[in-house]
Amino acid sequence: MQPRVLLVAGLLVLLACAQAIEAEDTSLLDKMQDYVKQATRTAQDALTSVKESEVAQQARGWVTDSISSLKDYWSTFKGKFTDFWDYTPKPEPSSS
């Protein structure tokens, strides 16, 4: 009779350990999900602050000004050399 009681007690201990491990796994998964959510929020906040920062706005202004200057330069260049690109020979008078 004692071996049966010992066997039942051992099985109960194993079941209790299995439930504890399963509870830990669920808890660990929840902690990881919370960590990922917090990291995502932190990254989004950092990106927002960078976008709104004075340095970023100044850099955007420099890029916009540079692109505008480049467009102006290109239109001036194109205007000066358009005669070369649109060259159509004048018809020569026929000598008949």
UniProtKB/Swiss-Prot annotation:
Stretch list, region Lipid-binding: 68-96
Cleavable signal peptide: 1-23
GO molecular function: high-density lipoprotein particle receptor binding; lipase inhibitor activity; phospholipid binding
Domain of life, source organism: Eukaryota
Tissue specificity annotation: Synthesized predominantly in liver and to a lesser degree in intestine.
SUPFAM superfamilies reported in the protein's UniProt record: Apolipoprotein
InterPro entries linked: Apo-CIII, Apo_CIII_sf
Gene3D superfamilies: Apolipoprotein CIII (6.10.90.10)
Keywords: Chylomicron, Lipid degradation, Lipid metabolism, Lipid transport, Secreted, Signal, Transport, VLDL
Location in or out of the cell: Secreted
GO biological process, one term: phospholipid efflux
A cellular-component GO term for this protein: intermediate-density lipoprotein particle
Family: Belongs to the apolipoprotein C3 family.
Role, per record: Component of triglyceride-rich very low density lipoproteins (VLDL) and high density lipoproteins (HDL) in plasma. Plays a multifaceted role in triglyceride homeostasis. Intracellularly, promotes hepatic very low density lipoprotein 1 (VLDL1) assembly and secretion; extracellularly, attenuates hydrolysis and clearance of triglyceride-rich lipoproteins (TRLs). Impairs the lipolysis of TRLs by inhibiting lipoprotein lipase and the hepatic uptake of TRLs by remnant receptors.
Protein name: Apolipoprotein C-III
